[in-house]
Structures are given as C-alpha cells and as structure tokens.
C-alpha cells in the first residue's frame, strides 16, 4: 500500500512538473505595436503568419502556381503539430520560429530619389519578428536566412558587422552601394530594415528609450472596428501621419513632384482637418481574401455627407449593358448624384482655407475629365439613378461613362457645348450619336441612357444595345459578380480584372523558387478564369468603409515587393524556354 501511494505521489509530481513546464515554455502573444516607433507613418502586423500562408495556399490563384511549376500541392503540417511545436519549442528551429513568430512592418519615412527624369518614392522601414525564442538559438538560422536573402537580392553583397551602443548590427550592402539590408537581434526580437536609421528607431523603442505606437489610443479603436485581433493581417496609419501620406500621394495623382514643399505643406495642413486615421485588415473569403478598410473622417465632414449619401432605391437595366470586355467598372448608386457631388465639395471646403478649397475643387473636377466631362455639376444634375464609369483597358486610355437620363434636353446642350460646333451626328436605333471633329470623343443619347467615350466604343455599345439588352455573356457576368452581386447594398461598387496583379504575383513566386513556368498559354487561360475583385464603399459612422474581395487580396501587391524578381520571370515571360 505504501509503495502504491508513493507511485501515485511520484506520478502526480511528474504530471505537475510537466504541466508547470508547459505553462512556463508556452509563449504569450504580445502587442507588436510595443516595438513600433510612435512616429511610424504606417504600421502592419500579422500575429498568425502561418495562417496567412495557409490562406494563400488555399486560394484558387495559388493552384495556378502549382500548375505553372508542375508540382503537386504540398500537404500542410497538421494544426495540432504546429500548435505543439509553437507551445513547446520542440522541433527544428526553423519550424519553431515559424510556429511562434509574430510579424510587424513599420514605415518610418517616405523619402524620394531621382531616377533620370522620374522622381521615385523610397520608403524607409523595418520588419519586426518576435520569435518568442532565445537569442542564442535563433541567431544562426536568422543570420543565414538574411545572408541568402541578400545574395538573392543583390548578387554579391558586401557584409559588414558593427557595434553601436553595445548592440551588434549586420549589414549586407549591394555592389552599387545604394541598397542595403540592415539587421540586429535583441533577445527574441529580430529587426530587419532597409536603412540603419529605421532599424535604430525600432531598436530604441524595444529598449524602452523611445515611445511606442501602442500608446496611440486610436490604434486599439481601429483594431476593434476592423476585427484586427481575428484578422490575418492588420494595418494602421495614425491620424497624425495620414496627412503626411496624403501630401506624398496627392501630388503623384495630380502629376506633380512630391518634392514640391509648398504644395505638400498645403495638403498636409488641410488634410488633417478632413481625414483621421486609416485602417486595414484581411480575412479569408470564398477561396480568396477579403480586405477591409476604414478611412476615418472628421465628425463635421460625416455630418455634412450623411443626408444625401443614400443609395438609389431602384436598379436600372444599365447594370447588365456593358461592352463585351471591361478592365474595371464602378457603379455609383445615389438618389441625387449632383447633391452628393456638391456635398463632397462643401464638406471639404468648410474645413479648409480658401486656397485649399480651390485646390480640392479642381482635384475633384479632374476626376471626371478623363471621361470627357468638364462640367460635373451640370452633367450630374441631368442624370439619375445609377452611374457607371468603365475602363476598357488597364492603362485607362479607353474609358466610358454610362448613366440614366433625367433631363434629355439639358444633356443635349451639354453634349453640343463639349463636342463643339463642327461635331457630326447620326442615329443608331433610338439613340443619337454625336462625335467631335477630331474623332476623339463621342456621345450616345437616347431617352433612357447617355453614353460617353471614344467613337468606336460608343458606337459598338449603342449597336449592341439595340439588339440585346444584355451585352455580356452569363458566364462573364458570373465571373465579374462572383464576390459581390449587382444587388449589393453599397453606394459604390467597383469590379476589377485582377489578372495583371495575379500574374506579377505568380512571377515573383516563381522567381523566389528559382523556377520557370511550364507554358504561358494554359497559365494565362487559368488566370483569365479567376473572378474579378469587388470593392464596396459605404459611408459609416466613422468615415468611408471599403470592403474588397478578390482572389488574393492585397497580398498580390505586397508579396512581389518583398520577393526579388529575377530577369526572365516577368509578366511577359511566363513561358517555357
């Protein structure tokens, strides 16, 4: 009996020790923002990197990668095995790091460099990797992985080790000397950046010498709003820095150099009076990815926009009357489009000075110039219900706009003024087609629909519409509306052909693997079968809410930026040798 008791006691003791050890070695998730500088322009995090990989590998787009390389899909490790490795730290060190890692990316500065006559934006930033594993264990494999990355990226880089304030830095410098990878390891944290300054900024925060982004009260609010704690990835731009990003982005949109300090100051000063923080999160959705965005607006701006930001109650037949192929199409569904236009101008103008109001009005007006509309207020007052803008090719050189007719006579006067006195006209069915003397623009006007675009596109559209009310095949419509139906309740819905982004993504993956596509024809055909992305935009309580559902989400844009692309594996070279 005594022996049995001792056996029970020893057994309980062993179980208690194992349980205590498991509790002790189990890593606790942390808020990665604690490592990000409070002054960060942009912050991205992924607390479940393996879930991101599983989601991407499970998409229909990734199956094309397997077909392109002729490889069979690789079975992913079982969830219980990943959990065991992550919990205990038992296993190959590479697997332990992957199972335990939390990632964050910070952009600390937006610099500009001149490339001939082109001014390029060159962000400075760093990747933060919390491995939840001791430095002595992670240092060798991390340094080896970074060395391979530098060799893939730069060819024959120069390696250099330096010590600053007692912390070792490792640099791999490209042969031309203008690019570099800088890294340091502090405890379980790995910091990798494209400049020493970016790495040192993050290091200072991790050593508690500088304040962190975690102290920003808007960060947690944005996480809650976008379900960031359950997301594959989460991104945040502090309200204090969103104007700075706009000061770089707006000049590029307007065709001005970001180096124009006076214009940037104008945008920065006034953007803060309109915009707040920005947020993004990504989630799995129907063998694809859903990206959610929140563009915060100041309360006064939201209050001004709300009354007229109402969706049109009726859906007209123009929703199905598209050309036989479009690169992208955007629906604007408002009861009164002209009132919404006026509200946009008034809401922004009421928050800024006179000069900035003029600049904003010019920027807003230019949005419709590419469609041949130079009097937005008059045009929008003469149309009703749904309004469609279409880009027939990726570069936007061929564009169209289609709208329902509210006032046919007003539209006729606008058309005559826009096309000039020497315009030519004829009729196709019940539509009058007018074309300018240079053959650059044409307008088709009937009692129900007005169409603006190039003469060839407008005529082709009008002739097709006269025969059938539905111009696209049902299979094409299903592909376009796969992620979002025409009946979406959003005010603005955009459908976009993602083929080019996916092709670039696949090229980057092939480059990383060091392989080439087996054949271009079948691969391009498979990419063409993927559904269009769909973006729904509404005005919520905090600002503009955008939800994009697509084959790969923003990962198709972000991954090619991280993976160096080798010569011969570009979009035009997805082919066999």
Q: Where are these predicted regions, by residue range?
A:
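Structural boundary/hinge residues at secondary-structure and domain interfaces
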Residues: 6-171, 221-275, 290-395, 415-420, ...
């Amino acid at each position: 009996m005594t022996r049995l008791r001792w056996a029970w006691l020893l057994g309980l003791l062993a179980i208690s020790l194992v349980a205590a050890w498991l509790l002790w070695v189990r890593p606790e998730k942390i808020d990665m923002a604690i490592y990000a500088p409070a002054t960060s322009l942009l912050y991205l995090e992924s607390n479940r990197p393996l879930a991101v990989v599983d989601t991407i590998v499970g998409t229909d787009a990734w199956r094309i990668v397997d077909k392109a390389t002729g490889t069979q899909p690789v079975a992913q490790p079982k969830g219980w095995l990943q959990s065991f490795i992550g919990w205990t730290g038992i296993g190959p060190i590479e697997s332990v790091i992957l199972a335990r890692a939390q990632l964050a990316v910070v952009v600390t500065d937006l610099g500009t460099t001149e490339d001939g006559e082109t001014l390029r934006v060159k962000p400075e930033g760093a990747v933060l990797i919390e491995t939840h594993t001791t430095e002595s264990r992670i240092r060798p494999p991390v340094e080896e992985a970074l060395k391979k990355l530098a060799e893939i990226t730069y060819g024959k880089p120069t390696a250099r080790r330096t010590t600053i304030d007692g912390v070792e830095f490792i640099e791999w410098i490209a042969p031309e000397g203008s690019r570099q990878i800088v890294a340091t390891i502090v405890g379980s944290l790995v910091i990798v950046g494209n400049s020493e300054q970016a790495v040192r900024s993050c290091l200072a925060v991790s050593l508690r010498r500088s304040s962190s982004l975690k102290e920003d009260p808007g960060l947690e609010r944005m996480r809650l709003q976008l379900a960031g704690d359950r997301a594959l990835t989460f991104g945040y731009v502090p309200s204090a820095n969103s104007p700075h990003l706009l000061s770089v982005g707006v000049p590029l949109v307007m065709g001005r150099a970001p180096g124009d300090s006076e214009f940037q100051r104008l945008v920065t000063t006034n953007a803060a009076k309109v915009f707040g923080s920005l947020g993004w999160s990504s989630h799995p959705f129907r063998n694809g990815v859903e990206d959610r965005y929140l563009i915060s607006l100041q309360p006064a701006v939201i209050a001004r926009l709300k009354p007229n930001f109402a969706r049109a109650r009726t859906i007209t037949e123009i929703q199905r009357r598209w050309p036989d192929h479009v690169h992208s199409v955007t629906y604007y569904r408002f009861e009164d489009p002209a009132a919404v236009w006026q509200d946009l101008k008034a809401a922004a103008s009421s928050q800024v000075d006179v000069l900035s109001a003029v600049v904003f009005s010019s920027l807003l007006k230019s949005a419709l110039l590419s469609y041949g509309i130079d009097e937005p207020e008059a045009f929008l007052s003469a149309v009703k219900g749904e309004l469609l803008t279409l880009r027939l090719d990726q570069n936007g050189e061929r564009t169209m706009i289609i709208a329902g007719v509210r006032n046919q006579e007003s539209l006729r006067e606008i058309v005559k003024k826009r096309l000039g006195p020497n315009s030519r006209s004829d009729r196709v069915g019940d539509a009058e087609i007018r074309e300018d003397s240079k053959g650059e623009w044409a307008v088709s006007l009937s009692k129900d629909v007005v169409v603006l675009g190039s003469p060839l596109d407008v005529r082709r559209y009008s002739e097709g519409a006269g025969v059938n009310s539905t111009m696209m095949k049902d299979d094409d419509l299903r592909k376009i509306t796969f992620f979002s139906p025409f009946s979406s309740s959003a005010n603005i819905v955009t459908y976009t052909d993602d083929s080019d982004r996916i092709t670039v993504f696949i090229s980057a993956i092939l480059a990383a693997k060091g392989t080439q596509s087996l054949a271009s024809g079948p691969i391009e055909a498979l990419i063409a079968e993927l559904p269009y992305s769909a973006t729904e935009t509404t005005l919520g309580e905090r600002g503009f809410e955008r939800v994009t559902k697509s084959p790969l989400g923003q990962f198709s844009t972000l991954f090619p930026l991280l993976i160096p692309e080798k010569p011969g594996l570009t979009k035009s070279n997805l082919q066999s040798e």
